[in-house]
Swiss-Prot record:
This is tRNA dimethylallyltransferase. Catalyzes the transfer of a dimethylallyl group onto the adenine at position 37 in tRNAs that read codons beginning with uridine, leading to the formation of N6-(dimethylallyl)adenosine (i(6)A). ATP binds at residues 5-12. InterPro entries: Dimethylallyltransferase, IPT, P-loop_NTPase. The gene is miaA. It comes from Shewanella denitrificans (strain OS217 / ATCC BAA-1090 / DSM 15013). The lineage of its organism: Bacteria, Pseudomonadati, Pseudomonadota, Gammaproteobacteria, Alteromonadales. It holds the Pfam family IPPT.
């Protein structure tokens, strides 16, 4: 079973209840929860919640490390098989839609990241600008060039990196995919009916995070000395804005405003993915009937 939804929509609480009452085991599908030492800003389930319903694929990486959709697919397939062998139902819960898509449909055989080539691309961008690199991509791979915006350095860099490593364009390589998920899946999405309600939930949750010590959490991460804002972990919503606040780029109130706005944008992107997602059953956040609906559709 998939339980998808935007941030702050109530996925975790519903998943824990489902796991307790209906013989499920939870696998996290979240690119932020994979990181250790990042508990408050990721809204990671607390010790009491994890005691009620353990989650697979959380706290598996140091914040200095990277983790791809391919890494997730590999690890999730191992966990799914183990859960099924135990006679239980895998319940995959989260909002990282790229992970869900990779698991469901399979992935193209793209080469692993090469830090040396990536740094060469960054150095060239620092000198020539990303606009010039985008022009290079358009010449190498017009299809990818049309799809990737010049102001999207992460995807632009990856497209060039793939070509420099393999000698083939990303468009060529993405025409072949690994096998789709070899299991029947029932898919659910949970969200408030009113976007205003979701925005209120996001603001309330960030306030609670601050009360729980989020700024202190980010300060501890900064104090390690080996982390920086270009790492995937530090690009997680809230962490980047709090880091910038601690470096003196803006004041506390601006940090709160920017972090909340970034979280709203994340939720908007997640909902955009979900509205185009096939074969999904929608649930309303907080509805008392959700557990019954999950169990009925599960069959």
């Amino acid at each position: 079973m998939f339980l998808m939804g935007p941030t702050a929509s109530g996925k975790t609480a519903l998943a824990i209840e489902m796991a307790q009452k209906h013989n499920c085991e939870i696998i996290s599908v979240d690119s932020a929860l994979i990181y250790k030492q990042m508990d408050i800003g990721t809204a990671k389930p607390n010790a009491a919640e994890l005691a009620l319903a353990p989650h697979k694929l959380i706290d598996i990486l140091d914040p200095s490390e990277s983790y791809s959709a391919a890494d997730f697919r590999r690890d999730a397939l191992i966990e799914i098989e183990a859960i099924i062998k135990r006679g239980k139902t895998p319940l995959l819960v989260g909002g990282t839609m790229m992970y869900f898509k990779a698991l469901l449909e399979g992935l193209s055989p793209l080469p692993s990241a090469d830090e040396t080539i990536r740094q060469q691309i960054q150095t060239r961008a620092d000198i020539e600008g990303w606009e010039a690199l985008h022009q290079s991509l358009c010449e190498i791979d017009p299809v990818a060039g049309a799809r990737i915006h010049p102001n999207d350095p992460q995807r632009l860099s990856r497209a060039l990196e793939v070509y420099y490593i393999s000698g083939k364009t990303m468009t060529e390589l993405t025409q072949t995919k690994s096998a789709a998920l070899p299991y029947e899946v029932v898919q659910f999405a949970i969200a408030p009916l009113d976007r205003k309600v979701l925005h209120e939930l996001i603001a309330k949750r960030f306030t609670i995070m601050l009360e729980q010590g989020f700024v202190e959490e980010v300060n501890s991460l900064m104090a390690r000395g080996d982390l920086h804002l270009d790492l995937p972990s530090m690009r997680c919503v809230g962490y980047r804005q709090c880091w910038q606040y601690l470096e003196g780029e803006f004041d506390y109130d601006t940090m709160v405003e920017k972090a909340t706005a970034a979280t709203r944008q994340l939720a908007k992107r997640q909902l955009t993915w979900l509205r185009g997602w096939p074969d999904v059953h929608w649930l309303e956040s907080g509805a008392e009937s959700n557990l019954v609906t999950l169990q009925r559709q599960r069959g």
